[in-house]
Regions:
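Hydrophobic alpha-helical membrane segments
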Residues: 98-106
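Solvent-exposed interhelical
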Residues: 84-94, 100
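Membrane-anchoring alpha-helices and their flanking helix-loop junctions
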Residues: 1-88, 105-163
Length: 163
C-alpha cells in the first residue's frame, strides 16, 4: 500500500485534473445534443420521448442513490477522503461507480430526447472519460480498502452485470 499517495492533499495529487476536465465535459453533454438535435415525427418521436424520459429518471435515481450512500464522504475528486468508508450497499451493490453510471444514463437519455447523433457520439467519449477516471480512482480505493479487490470481482464497474 502506498501510504504516501493517500496522504497527499494538493489539487493534482487528489486527481484534480480529472475534476477540471469533468465539469466542461458535463456541460458539453448538455449543450451538444441541444445544438445538433434533429426534428423527427410520428411514432418514433413518441418512443424516443418515453425511452429518454425513463433513462433520465433511472440515471437520476442511480446518481441520487450514490450521493445518499456516500453522504458526507462525497467528493468530485477520484481520491477518497481520508476518513471515508467503503460503500458496497444500495446503489454500490449494482455498480462500483453509480454516480458515473447515472450521469452516463442521463446523458444518453438527453441525447435520445433531442434526437442528436452528435450527442450519442459525445456520450461514448464521456463513457471513456469516466472509465479512465474510475480506473484511477480504483487504484486509490484498492490502496485504502483491502476488501476493495473482492468487491470489484463481485460488482461490475459501470454497466450493471456487463462491465
Amino acid at each position: 500500500m502506498h501510504k504516501d499517495t493517500m496522504q497527499k492533499s494538493g489539487f493534482s495529487a487528489r486527481g484534480g485534473w480529472w475534476v477540471a476536465v469533468q465539469f466542461p465535459l458535463l456541460l458539453l453533454a448538455y449543450l451538444i445534443p441541444g445544438w445538433s438535435g434533429q426534428d423527427i415525427g410520428g411514432d418514433l418521436f413518441i418512443v424516443l420521448r418515453v425511452v429518454s424520459q425513463v433513462l433520465i429518471g433511472i440515471g437520476a435515481l442511480l446518481t441520487l442513490g450514490g450521493v445518499v450512500a456516500l453522504g458526507r464522504w462525497l467528493t468530485p475528486f477520484p481520491q477518497p477522503l481520508p476518513e471515508s468508508k467503503l460503500r458496497t450497499g444500495g446503489a454500490y451493490a449494482l455498480v462500483r461507480h453509480p454516480l458515473y453510471t447515472g450521469i452516463l444514463i442521463m446523458a444518453l437519455g438527453w441525447s435520445l430526447m433531442t434526437h442528436s447523433l452528435a450527442g450519442l457520439v459525445f456520450d461514448v467519449m464521456l463513457f471513456v472519460f469516466f472509465d479512465r477516471k474510475a480506473a484511477r480512482e480504483e487504484v486509490w480505493l484498492a490502496e485504502k480498502f483491502p476488501e476493495y479487490k473482492a468487491y470489484s470481482k463481485r460488482v461490475k464497474k459501470i454497466v450493471p452485470w456487463v462491465y
